[in-house]
Design a protein with these regions (language model features):
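Carboxylate/His-rich catalytic cores and anion/metal-binding grooves
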Residues: 1-3
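Aromatic-rich, solvent-exposed beta-strand/loop patch
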Residues: 6
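Active-site glycine/GP-rich loop and adjacent strand/helix microenvironment
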Residues: 9-195
Length: 195
């Protein structure tokens, strides 16, 4: 898809995209400069990138208008990241679980519990990988991708499916994501991040 078409689609959908792969201090300065003109109500993106942007804003004594929510994805959200994001953007932070192969596997509710998006995926524990005393590899079946379906795809993430209900009112199954795939981010001396 041509770049102009991507920009047009984003404009029509009122979406502004920051590039997480180019997120050094100079890029974040530009993000902070354009942020007020966006009228943003939510933010969605990599946990580490949003957390570093929040830290950037905070260390420069900047401020932004409160958001309705921040949705983190693609990486493990650590407690200290959740805290700085919530503090700077003055809103709840919701962690979402997905992968590049199958998006929208699960999302956190208002009670902080992870619900499987059962209208998009079937999520199973790999029973061949041992007993339930430890997290087991997850098998994901996409109900959304008709062109290239993933059926019982083992994505190397580990978790536990819970046999209980949540008092938030969402009846979708609960899960705990215990161990996700490992990836490292390296911060270069000039502030650029290598993923």
């Amino acid at each position: 898809m041509p770049r102009w078409e991507i920009r047009l689609r984003q404009e029509l959908r009122r979406v502004y995209q920051f590039d997480p792969f180019h997120s050094g201090a100079s890029e974040m300065a530009q993000w902070l400069k354009v942020w007020p003109s966006l009228g943003a109500t939510i933010a969605h993106g990599y946990a580490s990138t949003i957390a570093r942007f929040a830290e950037y804003i905070e260390t420069r004594k900047g401020s932004v208008a409160p958001l309705r929510g921040v949705f983190t994805t693609a990486e493990k959200l650590y407690p200290q990241q959740r805290e700085v994001i919530a503090r700077v953007f003055n809103c709840r932070v919701y962690d979402c679980y997905g992968s590049s192969e199958v998006q929208n596997i699960a999302a956190e509710c208002s009670r902080g519990r992870m619900h499987v998006n059962a209208d998009f995926v079937v999520l199973e524990e790999d029973r061949a990988a041992g007993d339930r005393s430890t997290p087991r590899p997850l098998l994901v079946t996409s109900l959304w991708n008709y062109a290239m379906p993933f059926i019982r795809y083992r994505n190397e993430d580990c978790g536990v499916l819970l046999d209980e209900n949540c008092d938030c009112g969402n009846n979708f199954p609960l899960m705990e994501l215990n161990i996700a795939r490992v990836s490292d981010n390296f911060v270069l001396p000039d502030g650029r991040v290598v993923r």
